[in-house]
From Swiss-Prot:
The protein, known as: Poly(ADP-ribose) glycohydrolase
Biased composition regions of type Polar residues, renumbered to the chain: 280-291, 333-343
Protein's gene: PARG
UniProt-annotated binding residues for substrate: 727-728, 741, 755, 796, 870-875
Sequence segments annotated as region (A-domain): 1-457
Amino acid sequence: MSAGPGCEPCTKRPRWDAAATSPPAASDARSFPGRQRRVLDSKDAPVQFRVPPSSSGCALGRAGQHRGSATSLVFKQKTITSWMDTKGIKTVESESLHSKENNNTREESMMSSVQKDNFYQHNMEKLENVSQLGFDKSPVEKGTQYLKQHQTAAMCKWQNEGPHSERLLESEPPAVTLVPEQFSNANVDQSSPKDDHSDTNSEESRDNQQFLTHVKLANAKQTMEDEQGREARSHQKCGKACHPAEACAGCQQEETDVVSESPLSDTGSEDVGTGLKNANRLNRQESSLGNSPPFEKESEPESPMDVDNSKNSCQDSEADEETSPGFDEQEDSSSAQTANKPSRFQPREADTELRKRSSAKGGEIRLHFQFEGGESRAGMNDVNAKRPGSTSSLNVECRNSKQHGRKDSKITDHFMRVPKAEDKRKEQCEMKHQRTERKIPKYIPPHLSPDKKWLGTPIEEMRRMPRCGIRLPPLRPSANHTVTIRVDLLRIGEVPKPFPTHFKDLWDNKHVKMPCSEQNLYPVEDENGERAAGSRWELIQTALLNRLTRPQNLKDAILKYNVAYSKKWDFTALIDFWDKVLEEAEAQHLYQSILPDMVKIALCLPNICTQPIPLLKQKMNHSITMSQEQIASLLANAFFCTFPRRNAKMKSEYSSYPDINFNRLFEGRSSRKPEKLKTLFCYFRRVTEKKPTGLVTFTRQSLEDFPEWERCEKLLTRLHVTYEGTIEGNGQGMLQVDFANRFVGGGVTSAGLVQEEIRFLINPELIVSRLFTEVLDHNECLIITGTEQYSEYTGYAETYRWARSHEDRSERDDWQRRTTEIVAIDALHFRRYLDQFVPEKIRRELNKAYCGFLRPGVSSENLSAVATGNWGCGAFGGDARLKALIQILAAAVAERDVVYFTFGDSELMRDIYSMHTFLTERKLTVGEVYKLLLRYYNEECRNCSTPGPDIKLYPFIYHAVESCTQTTNQPGQRTGA
């Protein structure tokens, strides 16, 4: 490129590859698919250049198509020439250019804006003549003209001397972004007489935007034959990289057969299940938030208290935001410390220092490079490609000849900075630039058949209870284990006897305040009309022993001992269910059989639950083992809303505990409520017709010591992943994950109806945990062993339907518990997508999953596999692929295999399997994968100004690991520091 008449040409010029140096008209369409070459009018200034649409397959590590606009940012010619004159690389020149190489550098410093404008017009005239030539010139001249045309469209890439320049040389076409605010001092005419209409409406706003323009750099001194050969190879490579992946559609699950069955009777009417035929197919994919019904956002992060109780609301919870105080400062320091530790995937110190210097000088002129195929020696820094407006991970600054000199405020000041002594150094740099290094290709996961319904280790090979478990010790009460039955009288098939024989009352802040307690007083009027404190339990008995033939009778009975809420509680859902949903025969069976039996078992509470039930408070490691009959009595009391002190809001005594009384289940006209009531009445009918004989254990586990994730050297365990089936249906005998609210049960007693609430409905014995389990802290979980499934269902959220009664055939262990182990672990609720990639948030989720999976003192061969899925996604805002990787890492440290259910998402199934296979084949440790997660945040998410980063997590990991592997295999090189 010429600097115009009377100006000395650049001593360093950019090199262009074979695609750029071939004859323009002949190779333009081949080398740059989609590029539209314009014949520029000499009067047009400035010139607008169009960005070729890039394929998602060719752009390294990018998810989706190129986000550049078709009308890219207009670059001013003086700006380009200034960069070229100071930092350019030598290139082949035409005869007119060679005649100017002997000019004095003083002329370069005296260049004026007029001369620039003259050159601008001169250059456009040459570009205009390109389309009119017969292409009979020499290859050098043709390449020169084609070179000039593209030099007006993009910035020159300046490569530093030394190893860094060699690493930059290795890269394929970088995207160059010019920061327009930093050229405010350039003496260039900013007006444009003629241009497309798309640019005239955004002349002023264009200066505040950044666009990416693709530039090809190559060695112009190579012969044309070599260039043509490289061009052919580049076409072959691009064809492979751009090959579209076959779309794989997930198979839809078949709808559950409709059985005409009533939850109130084994021979119920046919109309109870009429809504099942039209129900939507099972959609358990919690990560599909976009199609969630209006209630789904309320249900999963449901508050166990009223809507005004912000403390108990997961959506309004402040606890989730307290995870990382000092969001930027604390995470920057912690992630920086981790990054300084030895690793196979550690970026080089030179690149780190360069990134720090470039990001700290916002007023300087910067070029942002997006690498497509190249790789730095550490193999990691080039993966970061930011959206416009974000800070790039690799900023190459314009520097003087010594690379560390003072920066001028004007680009034209650089013209006076090229001493003659630099000629020798430039020649040496030029020789280094000609050295080509092996390029690191983009990693593409192997193609997986779309017909596969599962991937990984066969589920039959996964460990299950009780076969993999050890023999349990004799059941005995201890300081950290409360047992409420006579262990000496425990027999198979017999109803356990309560212990002690007679009711023992403790009315304090360490135990559940029971409805039958003598301390449960209530203001009553005596015969003289005077108010006195009476027994509330006696009032409950009197109210419930009346005939409950109508829903209004049940409402009046409940409000008799809850007078304070007579004007607050709403029973619309209960009344509508009784009058509009149930058939006459079903309603008759309800008030003639089921409700009287429920009243009977509820009022037998002091004879069934004789031992005070301890509260499972925070920081406790304690277990409670009770009989299924005792749980049924407690839940019957919850249905009739008899538990005292559990209805107050805000800062009351039990404000840190979930709801237990069912009053919120009776309110409103939601279509969910009738189905929830059907499921619960099915349970009460079953347990009142035949007393259950098993035991259930509730364990609160609180950990103080967690792994140092960045130093963990354990390898990943086995994985089975499928898009069919459910956790409860196909994970028998495994550790089944409950995607819990920190108030266990979430909205099960109100409007919630997603994964956790559904599990609590079909296994209603889980609901009693809300009676004594305080809100979970970040280092805690709740483990429930022995609950029984009583119902089957179809649908999810708004489409949930009770289907039929279920006979649980799970085996029992030595303690007469069903071998169904459920762990409640609560994920964080992310209001911003990027927040979940903050290092401390990732550590918190790892620690939470690890807490749920760990069983201290139990060897790995005696631990069952973890049956899980899209934990913390859906309404909680989590990324399914990140959460899957987090659970895989936590399970590896806890020495458990993983069985992962994607709930109908076949693409997610293939992605998780491909990532797990990729990591295990390369024998990456948990610590190395954890460091990659930190790298992803630092390079892609920390400074991202858009809702989500351009490069997704899995492509980033693929490229990072593959790049490091390729670089390590090169002789004479080593990675990390």
